[in-house]
């Protein structure tokens, strides 16, 4: 029953309804052509050089590059931080970093990041099943205790970072992961929360090539 305002008028109904799962109900997906992919020939030389290098290595251009290239300054900032987190030195293996991306992106319902980074995870792990298992329910995936602890921490950062407590850090420490490792885990989860939301908001879709990689 609608409530009334101070002057007896019916209060406006909320514009957003919650589903049974507690998430806002959804309309049609964002059309990808609202933010079209950039034309390679129109980009600054440094962006073109990076994208061509990716194309030569992968055999195709992942859509994230051409979508973000619409704004060159943001492209540079995004990939500088991405590279620092995902390719820099640190206590986490490359596969562990990709697991974080897949698990937290699944929580955020980001099709692009789950599919794209799931492909990379399959390659690093040499396991055609692992990405699906981590995305659907990592707690049931055949993972070592260290990986499970990493994903527990990462998913808590993704869903309820204010609830993190000393016990969360202590559990990581039990698996040889100190405060700096926890920083890395949190940084990846937080960075990809940004990536997930931009992918969803821009209508970014995974390239078909990703689905076949590592199978």
Task: Please provide the spans of the model-predicted regions.
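Hydrophobic alpha-helical segments
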Residues: 2-215
């Amino acid at each position: 029953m609608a409530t009334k305002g101070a002057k007896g008028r019916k209060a406006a109904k909320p514009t957003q309804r919650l589903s049974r799962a507690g998430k806002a109900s959804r309309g049609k997906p964002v059309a990808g052509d609202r933010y079209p992919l950039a034309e390679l020939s129109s980009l600054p030389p440094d962006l073109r050089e990076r994208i061509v290098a990716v194309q030569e290595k992968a055999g195709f251009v992942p859509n994230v590059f051409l979508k973000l290239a619409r704004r060159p300054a943001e492209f540079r900032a995004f990939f500088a931080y991405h590279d620092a987190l995902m390719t820099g030195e640190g206590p986490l293996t490359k596969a562990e970093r990709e697991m974080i991306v897949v698990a937290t992106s699944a929580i955020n319902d980001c099709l692009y990041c789950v599919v794209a980074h799931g492909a990379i995870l399959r390659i690093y792990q040499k396991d055609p099943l692992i990405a699906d298992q981590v995305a659907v329910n990592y707690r049931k995936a055949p993972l070592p205790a260290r990986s499970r602890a990493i994903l527990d921490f990462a998913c808590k950062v993704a869903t309820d970072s204010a609830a993190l407590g000393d016990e969360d850090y202590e559990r990581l420490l039990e698996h040889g992961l100190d405060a700096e490792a926890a920083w890395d885990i949190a940084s990846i989860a937080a960075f990809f929360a940004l990536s997930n939301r931009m992918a969803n908001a821009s209508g970014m879709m995974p390239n078909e090539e990703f689905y076949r990689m590592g199978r």
